[in-house]
């Protein structure tokens, strides 16, 4: 299978943990203050846990006080795709991996400068790669 072909549901289930599958493929959310990266401070790059695409730099990570990893910008303009999410009786902006369309979390307009954005991301959606 080429990397351009979408994976089947069975392939995603085989590759991801049950928690990762629930969040990445079923648009779930992990409980606040429980994820591996909410209080993580190492230098490096956060990538999509499903496909490995680079998403965020640790230099853009900040403590939002919410209990989820928060970033004020994506690694680049192509890394994260956004779409309107109207679930749970709210209108929010969903953040998805541009490469594999996996659910990452949501984007809110209450972040710090320079962008004023807060990418509120599930730890289960991420893998961390330390800076060499």
Curated annotation (Swiss-Prot):
Active site positions: 120 (nucleophile)
Entry EC no(s): 1.8.4.12
Keywords from the named record: Metal-binding, Oxidoreductase, Zinc
Catalytic activity: L-methionyl-[protein] + [thioredoxin]-disulfide + H2O = L-methionyl-(R)-S-oxide-[protein] + [thioredoxin]-dithiol
Cofactor note: Binds 1 zinc ion per subunit. The zinc ion is important for the structural integrity of the protein.
Metal-binding recorded as keyword: yes
Coiled-coil segments: none
Pfam families: SelR
Gene Ontology cellular component annotations, sorted alphabetically: cytoplasm
Superkingdom classification of source: Bacteria
One GO term of the biological process aspect: protein repair
InterPro entries from the UniProt entry: Met_Sox_Rdtase_MsrB, Met_Sox_Rdtase_MsrB_dom, Mss4-like_sf
Residues annotated as binding Zn(2+): 48, 51, 97, 100
Keyword Membrane applies: no
Domain MsrB: 9-131
Classification via SUPFAM superfamilies: Mss4-like
Cofactor(s), by name: Zn(2+)
Single GO MF annotation: peptide-methionine (R)-S-oxide reductase activity
Alphabetized PANTHER family for the sequence: METHIONINE SULFOXIDE REDUCTASE (PTHR10173), METHIONINE-R-SULFOXIDE REDUCTASE B1 (PTHR10173:SF52)
Family the entry assigns: Belongs to the MsrB Met sulfoxide reductase family.
Name by which UniProt lists this protein: Peptide methionine sulfoxide reductase MsrB
Upper classification of the organism: Bacteria, Pseudomonadati, Pseudomonadota, Betaproteobacteria, Nitrosomonadales
């Amino acid at each position: 299978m080429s990397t351009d072909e979408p994976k089947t549901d069975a392939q995603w289930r085989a590759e991801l943990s049950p928690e990762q599958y629930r969040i990445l493929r079923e648009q779930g959310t992990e409980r606040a203050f429980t994820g591996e990266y909410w209080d993580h401070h190492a230098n490096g790059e956060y990538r999509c846990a499903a496909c490995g695409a680079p998403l965020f730099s640790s230099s853009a990570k900040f403590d939002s006080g919410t209990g989820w990893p928060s970033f004020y910008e994506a690694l680049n303009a192509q890394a994260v795709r956004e779409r309107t999410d109207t679930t749970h009786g709210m209108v929010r902006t969903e953040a998805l991996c541009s490469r594999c369309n996996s659910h990452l979390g949501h984007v809110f307009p209450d972040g710090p400068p320079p962008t004023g954005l807060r990418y509120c991301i599930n730890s289960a959606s991420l893998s961390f790669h330390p800076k060499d």
